[in-house]
Amino acid sequence: MPGSTRKLPVWLPILVLLIAMSSIQSGASLAKSLFPLVGAPGVTALRLALGTLILIAFFKPWRLRFAKEQRLPLLFYGLSLGGMNYLFYLSIQTVPLGIAVALEFTGPLAVALFSSRRPVDFIWVVLAVLGLWFLLPLGQDMSHVDLTGAALALGAGACWAVYILTGQRAGAEHGPATVAVGSLIAAIIFVPIGAVQAGDALWHWSILPLGLAVAVLSTALPYSLEMIALTRLPTRTFGTLMSMEPALAAVSGMIFLGETLTGIQILALCAIIAASMGSTLTIRREPQIKQVDVK
């Protein structure tokens, strides 16, 4: 009903975020299988080009009007979205998926840490940090991790932090439709880079269907869902809930790639999940939950 408002259930944006993270992990596995054919920059170009077309067709962003104070955050939102994709795909060329995701998570973890105000919030962040610490193959195995790939994953994490902070401001009015504009900004910068490096193979008929699947799983679906969660969850809660990402990556590697987990790593996953659950349970103590118009 026009002009009416309804308070969304607290659990709904959390469920939306979990679906988005699962979709991204599925897309990352598929994307990595395309690296031998078109390279990481080429997959980035496919993901952004096809994903942007889907988002534009669905959200029709030319109808949106952004206030002057939203334009700069929107620009940085789009640039960080593209940089996050590009650097992450470069990193998983040489770094295992689970490790790359864990290193990339330093971005949202930093957002959660610096946004914490109450002791209980800090507890969940510390618990997530401990989980990530033991999840990473520190010690003997760490010598086998490519340092350049690890640095690229950390760079992707920095872009992720900017994505979270600017996404909340840029999407405050238009919600998930903002993703279409942000993705277009990212595509303008990073699609030409990937297209030049991949060459004609990028647009081969056998590659395009797989690229479309990557675009849907890794861009169109999850970023739309994440924007819903971004504009309806506190910053620290969103950042801490994203700690599920490396846990999902590790479990995905175990199921689909045959990777085994040690007892300590299993405990680390439990710590990360506990941090996410704790953060979720404390949402109800927030003064307000964002309301949305139901048109």
From Swiss-Prot:
Keywords: Amino-acid transport, Cell inner membrane, Cell membrane, Membrane, Repeat, Transmembrane, Transmembrane helix, Transport. It comes from Salmonella typhimurium (strain LT2 / SGSC1412 / ATCC 700720). It is found in: Cell inner membrane. The chain crosses the membrane at residues 8-28, 39-59, 72-92, 94-114, 119-139, 147-167, 176-196, 201-221, 238-258, 263-283. One of its GO terms (molecular function) is threonine efflux transmembrane transporter activity. The gene is rhtA. Involved in the efflux of threonine and homoserine. InterPro entries: AA-Vitamin_Transporters, EamA_dom. Residues 30-135, 159-278 form the EamA domain. It is a multi-pass membrane protein. One of its GO terms (cellular component) is plasma membrane. Residues 29-38, 93, 140-146, 197-200, 259-262 are periplasmic. This is Threonine/homoserine exporter RhtA. Belongs to the drug/metabolite transporter (DMT) superfamily. 10 TMS drug/metabolite exporter (DME) (TC 2.A.7.3) family. Residues 1-7, 60-71, 115-118, 168-175, 222-237, 284-295 are cytoplasmic.
